Amino acid sequence: MSSINDPDAVRREYADEKRYAARMAKQETATGPDPYEVVFGAVAEQEPQEVLEVGCGRGELAERMSRELRAHVVALDQSARMVELTAARGVEAIVGDVVDLPFRDGSFDCAVAAWMLYHASDLDRALVELRRVVRPNGCLVAATSSERNLAEVWELVGEIGAPGGGFTVESAEPALRRHFGHVEQRDVFGTVTFPTREAAHSYIANTRTAETADRLPELDTPLVVSRHVAIFVCAR
């Protein structure tokens, strides 16, 4: 088990929102489709009444699903702080772990796991649990990043591929097909620009490879890097 899917390490990382916010700042310079819009659209297609979001973070997506889809949304996260932030948005939120969901079979029309399944201590167990709590005609919407996501910045600090775990764009489909009968992959490509060395350094310093940030060379021009993520719509 690595730090990316060690429950204690994950709870420490998300004990407050500062590191998460620093990583999300890169979205301000992103081009191409907004991956979170693709996730939201995939959920909206299902016209769900009951939605579970695991790994809810600060609760932006959960709040939007509740408001715009008029769905009952339950949000779950390992981090008490993230649950607190989500609850402050008026969303029902609880502390919990995706590998042991505290819900009855078939409780939800749709489950959402956006950029979090690489944190699962046991990926297959997490997928078993997500399938269990989704109704027979329901779905899972999962999202993750490619091993080559933001590759150019990682190469500058001597990393081979983006820091990740056992759930990447490249490995997700076979894992999902072990538990779901139909899996549709929706790729999203674009770029992210780090306008200065300081911006790139701040991003790296708030990831699991923070110790590599000081390897970043001086940048004479803004650093434009490629982005590749994918959303998977999975039916039982």
Task: Identify the meaning behind each predicted range.
Residues 50-100:
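Class I SAM-dependent methyltransferase SAM/SAH-binding core
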Residues 112:
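A conserved beta-strand element that flanks and buttresses the S-adenosyl-L-methionine
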Residues 1-47, 60-61, 139-167:
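Conserved class I S-adenosyl-L-methionine
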Residues 48-49, 106:
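Nucleotide donor/acceptor-binding cores
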